[in-house]
Amino acid sequence: SWETEEHSMFRESTRRFIEKEFVPNRERWIDQGYMEPEYWQKAGETGLLCPDVPVDFGGGGGDFGFDAITYEEAQRGCITSFGNAIQSIVAHYLLRYGTEDQKIRWLPKMATGEIITAIAMTEPGTGSDLQGVKTRAVRDGDDYLLTGSKIFITNGFNADLVCVVCKTDPEQGAK
């Protein structure tokens, strides 16, 4: 089995947390379509967010198995409104492509649940074909101006930080 003793202990504490804090709120979250920010913060305090992000950036310093356990236990409790997978995906985009300043600024707050993230990939007419995205980002001084449309943005309702898939140079094709 891939689970170590540390993974098993994490699984048990994750299961207890989800049963105590999330399951009693499940129906309300389904009805309203999102989980309130204070529950993200409770999850962060418990170590359920970004458990495989390096400790230097506020994460748990573990391996992907810890993320997998949080996904499994959330699904076990039928908690579909806990978009922690998105939190992890955005964290890894930041780890791979972000500047040092961005990592320091955002990752610790993502791990505590102070910042909720979303990913805007899917577009009307192209779905999730990332090579076919039409959304553009054009440099405007120190900023970028975005033009385009996105749909099905998980966590979009209450996100503080959104990772947007777009093209800065359509001549580059899929790059």
Language-model regions, residue ranges each:
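Intrinsic disorder at enzyme termini
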Residues: 1-9
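Internal helix-loop-helix
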Residues: 3, 45-114, 154-161
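Short secondary-structure junction/hinge motifs that connect adjacent elements
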Residues: 24-46
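A short, Trp-centered hydrophobic/proline-enriched beta-strand micro-motif
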Residues: 113-121
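Hydrophobic, small-residue-rich alpha-helical packing segments that form membrane-like cores
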Residues: 126-129, 144
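A structural signal for short hydrophobic beta-strand segments in well-ordered beta-sheet cores
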Residues: 135-137
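A short core secondary-structure module
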Residues: 143, 147-175
